[in-house]
Amino acid sequence: GFDPDLKAILEEQKKPVSFWEDGLGTFTLNRSVGWFETEAEWLGQPARLDFDRDENRADCLTHFHTLMERQEEWDQRVRGLAAEKLLDLANDWAQESEEGRETAEITQEQFMERMELDAIQIYEDGAFEFWFNDGDLFWGHSIHVTGSLTNGPEEAQMEG
């Protein structure tokens, strides 16, 4: 037979772990990656917000509220840094993909518009990671911007 105590423990571990946060929604533990996540609206578009379950929950939620209260400002800063760091690379990729055909240069504005926010990850110390779908700037790779609430966006790279 199967140990009933063990079965009870297993059943308990399968139950969803979640909590509600005003203004952000219901965070649910995603056990496969070890983080709490919710889907929120960022400038009218859906985006995942997540933080590692080992981080201080209250601090992470405070930092999410800080970002959410000034979405437009943070969005412009993060996209602006990504364009500053990656625009030349995007134009190199565009030239390569057209192999000799004349292609219009991608502008900073076009680059920023094509980025589609996928997720924001926050840490208890105020560090953050923004993950974007690339709008085919890099043939379907991700754009990853890291920084902190204190220093703003600092690094951007193409990944995946």
Predicted regions and their residues:
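N-terminal "domain-start" segment
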Residues: 1-94
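Soluble extracytoplasmic regions of secretory-pathway and membrane proteins
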Residues: 76-105, 112-116, 126-128
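Acidic, proline/glycine-rich low-complexity IDRs
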Residues: 1-27, 35, 104-160
